[in-house]
C-alpha cells in the first residue's frame, strides 16, 4: 500500500517527513497496512489493531489512518474519503475513531513510545 507521508521543508531547505503512516485500513481496495517496523509487536496486539481498523472502515467506509508525527512525537488519528464517496459517514467515523483512541489508549501510548525511538533513528 502506498504510504501517504506528510512532508515539510526544514530550516536547511530539505524536505523531511513529518507524519509517517503506520496503520492504514482502506475500505475501497479492502487493504490493511501495518508498517513493517511494527512487526516486533506481539501477535495479539497486531491482530487487535487489524480487527479494530478493518471493522471501522467496513462500518463507516473510507480510509482510517494512524500516523506518527515525528515533530510532536505523537500519533495522529484520521479518517478520510474519496471525493466521489457519498456513503462515507464522517461524523460517525470521527466518533468511532475517537472511541478507539480512548479504549486502546494504553496500546497506542506504547506504540507512540516505540515509534519515537524506532522511526526517529534513536535506537
Spans of features found by a protein language model:
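A broad, low-amplitude sensor of folded, mature protein cores
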Residues: 34-47, 96-97, 102, 111, ...
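Negatively charged, low-complexity tracts enriched in Asp/Glu with abundant Ser/Thr
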Residues: 4-59
Amino acid at each position: 500500500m502506498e504510504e501517504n507521508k506528510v512532508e515539510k521543508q526544514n530550516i536547511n531547505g530539505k524536505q523531511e517527513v513529518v507524519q509517517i503512516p503506520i496503520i492504514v485500513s482502506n475500505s475501497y481496495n479492502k487493504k490493511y497496512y501495518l508498517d513493517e517496523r511494527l512487526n516486533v509487536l506481539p501477535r495479539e496486539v497486531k491482530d487487535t489493531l487489524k480487527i479494530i481498523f478493518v471493522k471501522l472502515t467496513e462500518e463507516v467506509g473510507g480510509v482510517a489512518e494512524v500516523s506518527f508525527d515525528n515533530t510532536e512525537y505523537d500519533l495522529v488519528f484520521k479518517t478520510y474519503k474519496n471525493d466521489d464517496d457519498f456513503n462515507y459517514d464522517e461524523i460517525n467515523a470521527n466518533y468511532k475513531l475517537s472511541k478507539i483512541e480512548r479504549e486502546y489508549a494504553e496500546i497506542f501510548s506504547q506504540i507512540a513510545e516505540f515509534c519515537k525511538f524506532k522511526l526517529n533513528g534513536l535506537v
